[in-house]
């Protein structure tokens, strides 16, 4: 983590998903920067009960303190920072949560139903499913429901495309997804030229997460 007196390195921030080549372009973000002129932006990479680990470059992380109000039992969980959130830091203290561009949420257990943010500011979600015994259209649909409505772009990635006896059947089952303009790719992860089909979603300032069962080919 850089010193507070150092200029903000937006190029380094872009490598961890900062969505612009320079200063923030959203008015709501600009307003918070103006309200906290001494603060610096960072991204939450770990979430703990009383604090967070925040980064401002790929290998620069800092343990930080969350605002006192975030630790109150009745404070709404979705108003606390989550992994992927951008925050403003003054020293080791989080002084502002920058408005989320996107959010992936799920229902949280408790006396009253509420939604929990499990990842924020995600541009693309690769929903990974193997074209082998792992292939499960219903699981893909569940992931699409999880992603839907949060602003992130779902991309269905069918791995192990070298197992051609499954590929065409799988694509036929998922024709409906294509009709909904959801990108659908069948790739062979062992072939770099095949995996290169994912590059359009992996540009500077882009944040991608992968979801799928164990053994689906996410690695």
At which residue positions do the language-model features occur?
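N-terminal accessory targeting/assembly segments
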Residues: 1-137
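Non-catalytic alpha-helical coupling and interface elements of nucleotide-dependent molecular machines
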Residues: 49, 89-92, 99-103, 149-152, ...
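Short, glycine/charged-enriched secondary-structure capping and boundary segments
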Residues: 58-60, 109-110, 140-143, 170-173, ...
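Short beta-alpha junctions and helix-cap segments that line functional grooves
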Residues: 74-77, 143, 198
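A broadly tuned preference for mixed-charge, low-complexity surface segments
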Residues: 93-111, 141-144, 184, 207-217
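Phosphate-binding glycine-rich loops and their immediate beta-loop-alpha structural context
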Residues: 118-185
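Canonical P-loop GTPase G-domain recognition
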Residues: 153, 162-219
